Amino acid sequence: MNLHEYQGKQLFAEYGLPVSKGYAVDTPEAAAEACDKIGGTEWVVKAQVHAGGRGKAGGVKLVRSKEDAKAFAQQWLGKRLVTYQTDANGQPVTKILVESCTDIAKELYLGAVVDRSSRRIVFMASTEGGVDIEKIAEETPEKILKATIDPLVGAQPFQGRELAFQLGLEGKQVAQFAKIFVGLAKLFQDHDLALLEVNPLVIKADGDLHCLDAKINIDANAMYRQPKLKTFHDPSQDDPREAHAAKFELNYVALEGNIGCMVNGAGLAMGTMDIVNLHGGKPANFLDVGGGATKERVTEAFKIILSDSNVAAVLVNIFGGIVRCDMIAEGIIGAVKEVGVKIPVVVRLEGNNAELGAKVLAESGLNIIAATSLTDAAQQVVKAAEGK
């Protein structure tokens, strides 16, 4: 689950980290009032969406009057912001963050993720702040500094000081960085985060460090023990299809292709998408129906896939283990009849009673193409999507 910038900064402040004074508002009038509360003559107004690239898309602006802040809120509230990280529809803007202006001397990067290979929280820092860390990692990986957190003792101040020295910080900045480093690590562990970024972490004109942005992603598997963070969830930022799928315990992620994919098992689903790509197709989604591919779940899966108007064909790839393939085939047939699927459906069944499942599909009289292998399934669905 992602948090908005203003929510992330709220957590930062609770851990004593330096953030700008600001208010999240949902009306133009409140934006003007926020300027009065903050004081000063310049403010930064930011559209709140779960996506990066807001500045280039016009979603972040420096304003020098309350009228300009109000006009910015009128421009964006209730609208959708399209950035390079969103789809063509963009994300709805329901909040505007109004905060004090910061005089920036230098921008740094500080972030943390769970590293699967070391099974540790790993902090990353760089002198290249304010840009995409992925681009830095690809083009100049030597500019990314790392510190691994021991889960038994947590982040240690000396690790923060080491990173600070490597970043070229001096004097009071070293102690400030160490405090921010330890605070962020504690925040990461306390709230079961999957990702945390301060981009940029800035050096102000007076030499002090300041957290100018906040990006936080919480591990969805740990939400049951984070009741406070559950209240931070903004459903307006969710893809409606993904939200609907979650109600039926279906793991769905919308993509931009034209071949719908329905698979049982996350690994098999990723492999299926890869082989579709290999044969010239473009998956329209990732969809894992899980171990229990019942008629009800398959039916809902078809409904979700077909809600995407770009889908020209569907590939169903099921491995029968505990659940028999003939039962799965009957579920697919029932779902196709109930939903009224008009586009080609290619089905590959493997495992328990696979031959019987293929026979059931062949005798159904429906527009279902039984594939003999995964390669055959990929080739068949690509042809079907192209109308061949």
UniProtKB/Swiss-Prot annotation:
Protein name: Succinate--CoA ligase [ADP-forming] subunit beta
Assembly description: Heterotetramer of two alpha and two beta subunits.
Residues annotated as binding Mg(2+): 199, 213
Gene3D superfamilies given in the database record: ATP-grasp fold, A domain (3.30.1490.20), ATP-grasp fold, B domain (3.30.470.20), Succinyl-CoA synthetase domains (3.40.50.261)
Described function: Succinyl-CoA synthetase functions in the citric acid cycle (TCA), coupling the hydrolysis of succinyl-CoA to the synthesis of either ATP or GTP and thus represents the only step of substrate-level phosphorylation in the TCA. The beta subunit provides nucleotide specificity of the enzyme and binds the substrate succinate, while the binding sites for coenzyme A and phosphate are found in the alpha subunit.
Residues where substrate binds: 264, 321-323
GO MF: ATP binding; magnesium ion binding; succinate-CoA ligase (ADP-forming) activity; succinate-CoA ligase (GDP-forming) activity
Binding of ATP, residues: 46, 53-55, 99, 102, 107
Enzyme class: ligase
Keywords: ATP-binding, Ligase, Magnesium, Metal-binding, Nucleotide-binding, Tricarboxylic acid cycle
UniProt remark on cofactor binding: Binds 1 Mg(2+) ion per subunit.
Catalytic activity of the protein: succinate + ATP + CoA = succinyl-CoA + ADP + phosphate; GTP + succinate + CoA = succinyl-CoA + GDP + phosphate
Biological processes per GO annotation: succinyl-CoA metabolic process; tricarboxylic acid cycle
EC number: 6.2.1.5
Family per record: Belongs to the succinate/malate CoA ligase beta subunit family.
Lineage of source species: Bacteria, Pseudomonadati, Pseudomonadota, Gammaproteobacteria, Pseudomonadales
Signal peptide location: none
Pathway: Carbohydrate metabolism; tricarboxylic acid cycle; succinate from succinyl-CoA (ligase route): step 1/1
S-S bonds: none
A GO CC annotation given for this chain: succinate-CoA ligase complex
